[in-house]
């Protein structure tokens, strides 16, 4: 901060070197609050100097949720019923939890069978192992239907 204060008086009176040095010693005491006020502007200048980094949105990562899909299924099943944000958050957490369990089980199955790839067969077996009874049967049939629809289109 002090070099900035020395440059200003020197620029005004280049012929007088000694008085400029004396003024430079006196100037920092009076100009320090101004320099401190300039710090946020200085940060902005640094930000503009790093235009690429400051221009990009650094903060928020995209968080993938199932909220849209939960809402669509709710409207298919019960068109007249709504859902609170807390209930939606619980449902989203539930689906994430089930997805993680299925993925972990499918990965274990692939490792046991010494296969490098998780296929629909591992997913189907994981569903049968993770989900209980009738729920597993319905999930397998819906999954098979979805896969055949996807491959046919």
From Swiss-Prot:
One of its GO terms (cellular component) is nucleus. Can be acetylated to form H2BK6ac and H2BK33ac. Monoubiquitinated by BRE1 to form H2BK143ub1 and deubiquitinated by UBP26. Required for heterochromatic histone H3 di- and trimethylation at H3K4me. May give a specific tag for epigenetic transcriptional activation. CDD domains: HFD_H2B (cd22910). One of its GO terms (molecular function) is DNA binding. Belongs to the histone H2B family. The modification N6-acetyllysine is found at residues 7, 37. Core component of nucleosome. Nucleosomes wrap and compact DNA into chromatin, limiting DNA accessibility to the cellular machineries which require DNA as a template. Histones thereby play a central role in transcription regulation, DNA repair, DNA replication and chromosomal stability. DNA accessibility is regulated via a complex set of post-translational modifications of histones, also called histone code, and nucleosome remodeling. It holds the Pfam family Histone. SUPFAM superfamilies: Histone-fold (SSF47113). Residues 1-60 are annotated as: Disordered. Gene3D superfamilies: Histone, subunit A. It is found in: Nucleus; Chromosome. It comes from the Eukaryota. This is Histone H2B.6. Keywords: Acetylation, Chromosome, DNA-binding, Isopeptide bond, Nucleosome core, Nucleus, Ubl conjugation. SMART domains: H2B (SM00427). Its main location: nucleus. PANTHER family: HISTONE H2B (PTHR23428). There is a cross-link at residue 149 (Glycyl lysine isopeptide (Lys-Gly) (interchain with G-Cter in ubiquitin)).
């Amino acid at each position: 901060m002090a070099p900035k204060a020395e440059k200003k008086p020197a620029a005004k009176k280049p012929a007088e070197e000694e008085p400029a040095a004396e003024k430079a010693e006196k100037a920092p005491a009076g100009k320090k609050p101004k320099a401190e006020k300039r710090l946020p502007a200085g940060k902005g200048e640094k930000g503009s100097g790093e235009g690429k980094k400051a221009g990009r949105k650094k903060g928020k990562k995209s968080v993938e949720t199932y909220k849209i899909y939960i809402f669509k299924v709710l409207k298919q099943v019960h068109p007249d019923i709504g859902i609170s944000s807390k209930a939606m958050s619980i449902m989203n957490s539930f689906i994430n939890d089930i997805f993680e369990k299925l993925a972990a089980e499918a990965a274990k199955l692939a490792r046991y069978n010494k296969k490098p790839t998780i296929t629909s067969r591992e997913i189907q077996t994981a569903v049968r192992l993770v989900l209980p009874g009738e729920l597993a049967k319905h999930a397998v049939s819906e999954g098979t239907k979805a896969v055949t629809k996807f491959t046919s289109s």
